[in-house]
Amino acid sequence: SGSATAEMLHFLTACIRYGVSVCIAGSTGSGKTTIMAWLLSNVPNNRRLITIEEGSREFDLVKRDAQGNILNSVVHLLTRPSENPALNINQDFLLERVLRKHPDVIGVGEMRSAAESLSAAESSRTGHTVCTTIHSNSCNSTYRRMMTLAKRKYNMDDSILMQIMVEAYPIIVFTKQLEDRSRKIMEIIEGEDYQDGRLIAHSLYKYEVEDNVTDDRGETRVVGHHKKIGLISDSLKKRLLDNGISNKELEEFMQPPKEVG
């Protein structure tokens, strides 16, 4: 199978379209940015999309017709680092100003600092749909990674920060480059809450590696498949419905777990 199944991609697209923020986690070269760019390219043309990137611009999401007329509402922003604090334009600075433009969807290239971590989370918790990426080793450790970033600057209790992150990003996607250099979405989870020092989350989809087969030339091929593990919670279902998804579209994600792909 490919990096994900059609159902998995449809689910993630529906989340972004219907107001559920998504964080894509993984190491360098795992395909995080590629997946994020694909998801943002599927934002409906009538939604206002603003992206914020650091360093170089990787997104080009402006759509045009055959005559070159722009079809969608997209603004791409880049940071401009400076030693002079008065001239330094970082992601946190841009995020604050982006919110005044009333975007429907915000794409934050990557969360690297404490300020970005909390600013992006607060943007999501105040009704904006955020799609971002972060370096992390698994779905479940992603929330703790966000919390650790935020702790570098903000003297807040761990449990409060964890609750903020879980509320801000109900959906976490973990990507990985496997031994044969193929890139897979390894897992999608739904985070529901953080109580008594424990993350309450459940897996929705997983990629299960069955074997790593080496041929006569010494090249490895990964054998595996994607599997549907669980269903979205009633609260996420209600949120999607409240934000405009049809029961027909929702039905696909409510089918009992089975082998997919």
Predicted regions and their residues:
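P-loop NTP-binding catalytic core
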Residues: 1-18
